[in-house]
Structure formats: C-alpha cells, structure tokens
Amino acid sequence: MQIFEELESAVRSYSRGWPTIFEKAKGYKLWDIDGNMYIDFFAGAGALNYGHNHDTMQEKLIAYIQDDHIIHSLDMGTTPRKTFLETFHNTILKPRNLDYKIMFPGPTGTNTVESALKIARKVTGRDTVISFTNAFHGMTIGSLSVTGNSFKRHGAGVPLHHSVSMPYDKYVNDQDSIAYLERFLEDSGSGVALPAAIILETVQGEGGINAASIEWLQKIASICERWDILLIIDDVQAGCGRTGTFFSFEPAGIAPDIVCLSKSIGGIGLPMAITLIKPEYDQWGPGEHNGTFRGNNLAFIAATEALTAFWQDNTFSKSIIQKSKLVRQRIDRIIDKFPSLQGEARGRGLMQGIVIPEPNCASEICKAAFDIGLIVETSGPNDEVVKFLPPLIIDKEGINQGFDILEVSMEHVLKK
C-alpha cells in the first residue's frame, strides 16, 4: 500500500478503508494478492449488479476485441450501439409502455444528471431545480448544486446556484413534506421561483438509504404534472434491478419525464450512462451536449448481454425480491440481537441498511468486517448507516455468509 500512499493523490478513499491490493473477482467474491477471500456487499457502489466477470459478458467482450472491432466511436454508428438501442427498447421500454429517446451523455452518473438538468432548463426556459435533503447526484458543478451533502458541496470551490432543497419523505418526523413543497410553489412570497424540474432518488443511496414511500412519489409526480414541472428520476444507483424492478419507480406507477441511468447499465462494470428523455422534450441541437467517451462499444456489448440474460421476463426480478426478504430478516435479527446499537432498518430491494446512531460505530463495524472477509461500506451524512449493496446475483449462502461475518464484527466492536 506504500506506493498508493507515496504516488497517488490524497483524494483516494476506498483504498484507505480497504487497505489491500485486490487481484481477482468472480460473482460476489473478491480475492487479494495474499489469497484472502472477501464477500462483496458493495458491488462497485452499485456498478456490478450482475456480479464480477459474468461468464457470457466476458466471452462476448473477448471475442469482440480479438476480431478487431471498433472500440472507440464517439456517437458514430456501430453495430453494438444499434443492437443495444434495439434491445433496450424492446426488452425494457416497450414491455413497460414507456416511450423515451435514449441519449448517451458520457460514461458516468454525473454526466447523465448534468444532461438532464440542461435539457430541463432548455425546454422550460426556467433555471431553478428543486432537489431534496440528503440527495446525492454527482461530483460536477451542476450535479453538486442539487446534492445535499455539505462536505461534497464545499469541494466545488464556488457558490452553487439555481437549486432549492426541500425535505425528502420522512425527513422531519410527523411533518408532511408534500404539503410543505406545495405551499412553497403556491405562495408568491416563498422566494422559490417556479422550477424547471424536480430531481430525486427513490432510494437515497449515499444519503442514508432513505426510501421514499410509493404515495410520496405519486404525489411528487402529481405536483409536477399540475405545475408543468419536469420530473427527473436519478436511477443511477437504484436502477437496473437494484430495488427489485428494473426501474426503481415502477411500483409507483409513474412515468418520469427524464430518467438518469449509469453504474450497472454497463453490465460488467464498464463506464456507461444513458439519459432517457420523453420525445417531446428531446429538443437538443446536434452536438449541443457531447463527450469523447459516450460511445463505449465494449459497454454496449456487455449491457446488451445483461438485458438479454436477465430481463427477458420477470424471473430475475422475482429472485431479487426473494433475496431482499432474506436481507431484511438478517437485519431484523441484528437489531434484536444487539439492542444497544439502537439499530433501524432502511431501504428496499437489495439496497438496504442499518442505521446506528452511535458516532463512528458504523464505520468501526465496516472496518472490523473487512478484517474478517466482508466488503461493506457506510452511508449517510454522518456515515451512520451500514449499507448493504451486494451483487443481485448473490445466492442465499452468500447473503448468510456475509451477515454472519457482520454479526461477528458487531460483537467485536461492542466488546471494545
């Protein structure tokens, strides 16, 4: 680890929390250079929903490269691009009666958010965007402006304008955040201009695994319709099956105006992002938003295979929901077994967590878990949540093995 300390920027973070050199990974397991095996409850921060090195994705990528096919192409026409567009439309959009234009904004989550904010402002002619407490939407200036975390916002180095933060669902106990939002929009003295868009995560991944209720999401959608505000759903982490359905908003029965996808849309962990835009709002001029690496053909190959292998029917979705029930059972068991932690369960699907109010306790648990073979991180504004984000392909044995390690880690921390 000395090389990283000496040569790499101080901005690095994950290598500090997991101080080893990883060498190999398959499915939901990783190995370091010393042969130590780790259960993965992190999944590349949600970029590895289909696990590490999925066999057929791996095979198709190797074959494509060996045949000297196009790797880099910006937004030029290529066979992988064409095949992905057709597959995504026929496998994901059409069965859900969703009609979107598919935009490739650049390869990261913040790219898709930036493009969503830009097109919303262009279409409406307004500049303000409403976001929510504890939101996280990315690390570039536009995305940071709608992010709640003060540490990350401060890193911008400049004032962040044209956004207003509103309370997320259940942010304040016994307070109706919907009524609060409606009052701000209705009252000409609120100081809040009619916004171009409202942007939200249905489950706040970095903000503490806060899951919005179905009713709250439906009311937000109704507000947007009433006031002619565009609804942007940031599904970068909660999408691609993470909460049980391909899109996290499906259970609410809503159809956002714009949807942001990245992370696991690339299938095997390759950089890729897409922005889904209702056709009437696809008012870009050619090249008005672009990027050198928005045509990642290797990601198109893996993404298409992921859609074909996992999303032709609802079998995979059902398996995620079943596994999520086991995760919740293990969380409830921990809460009962360790009452001194004052734990609280949060999240849905395979995007869950335990809130531990004692300062630094969640971080200590994650550190202890790493030492005995579990990769798991914290979430929340004060790192107060132990966050569970395993690959969606994990089996029951892997879930139980990971939680067994977690319980041992908690016992170790509580004995200190």
From Swiss-Prot:
Gene symbol here is ectB
Biological-process GO terms, alphabetical: ectoine biosynthetic process
One GO MF term attached to the UniProt entry = diaminobutyrate-pyruvate transaminase activity
- Tell me which UniProt keywords the record has, alphabetically: Aminotransferase, Pyridoxal phosphate, Transferase
**Which CDD domains does the UniProt entry name for this protein?**
OAT_like
Protein name in UniProt: Diaminobutyrate--2-oxoglutarate transaminase
Give the record's family classification.
Answer: Belongs to the class-III pyridoxal-phosphate-dependent aminotransferase family.
Query: Which cofactors must be present for this protein to function?
Result: pyridoxal 5'-phosphate
The protein's enzyme class: transferase
Annotated pathway: Amine and polyamine biosynthesis; ectoine biosynthesis; L-ectoine from L-aspartate 4-semialdehyde: step 1/3
Please name the taxonomic classification of the source: Bacteria, Bacillati, Bacillota, Bacilli, Bacillales
